């Protein structure tokens, strides 16, 4: 027997928890990956700036700077994993193109503690329990001219953010990330309930333009990973799988 869930949609994409998609806590996950790479002999340089880049026939010449030293490094292949910050794009003055076929959007996001939970039943209809706890999956709140995501991790902290269409939110677009977030949350009762006691773990961040496409995505001895080459919207993002697939193709 089907139950009418009003305006809620649940998608059971994974058959069980063992093989389910995972929401990674990036600080721990990235630290784990760095540790694995170092065990394999990779030289890891933290807090490093690349001040210049020169393409050559047999590699890429980099001028790098750390807190302690400056040096020149030559790489046979340079892979850009900087995402929207466009590391190689900035060094080689490669232009970002606007995606003409999709809405122009901006975003604010951060991590929070003290976010209220979503009950495992439909609060609007007062019906029985849902087939699984909503916060075992990614939560997407659809709002006028945008959407809000909420990802709760095992330790209770929440990754949350809003993607907003510029033409719908032009009046607040240039405000601080905190002001934009408050404006969006306070306009929607459910978001206000969830975040009224939430505390950001660090200052919220703003992405001035979410969607983009780089005019060049590879060269003789360099290449951009998908998130550096272009992006549409987090709602359409595959996350790690597309990145891992690209790395696998580069390796073989």
Go through each PLM region and give its residues:
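Short, histidine-centered active-site or binding-site loop motifs used for metal coordination
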Residues: 15, 162-166, 228-229
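Acidic side chains
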Residues: 21, 30, 80-82, 136, ...
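Predominantly flavin-linked oxidoreductase catalytic cores and closely associated redox partners
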Residues: 25, 35-192, 247
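FAD/FMN-dependent oxidoreductases across multiple families
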Residues: 144-148, 154, 168-252
